[in-house]
Amino acid sequence: MEIALSVNGREVIRDVAPQELLLDFLRDSLGLTGAKRSCDVQVCGACTVLVDGLPVSSCCFLAAQADGSEVTTIEGLAERPEFERLEEAFTRHAALQCGFCTPGMLLTVSALLESGELDSQDEIKRCLAGNLCRCTGYRGILEAVADLAGVA
């Protein structure tokens, strides 16, 4: 089946199998490897991308579901002016180590900052619950996001 979508601001038209996952489409068909495969059950957040501005787990989202949508991967976010702010905050607060979770984390945080939902420490924790990090212990991540959101 043919799908047409925008990926990181570029129009893409491709044939996909009905069962092809968005994660596989991005990685295998488009060579965008920032979204990572890890749990395959929407738990870890490593595969997070934005579809029409909202974070989705691309490991459980069909490529066909993205037909007509705007998909943003970490590669696309890195081209945006706001990426530098995210990168600086995560670096300043030592919010990353191995980096495996970082693309999904940054995409989630970007969408949440844009929505204005991050107004308390508890809200930050709730919103990041779908993004697991095995290295940092979360303190630096929570500090970076609080800094970005202006939450004390």
Model segments located where?
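Signature of N-terminal electron-transfer/Fe-S-associated modules in redox systems
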Residues: 1-152
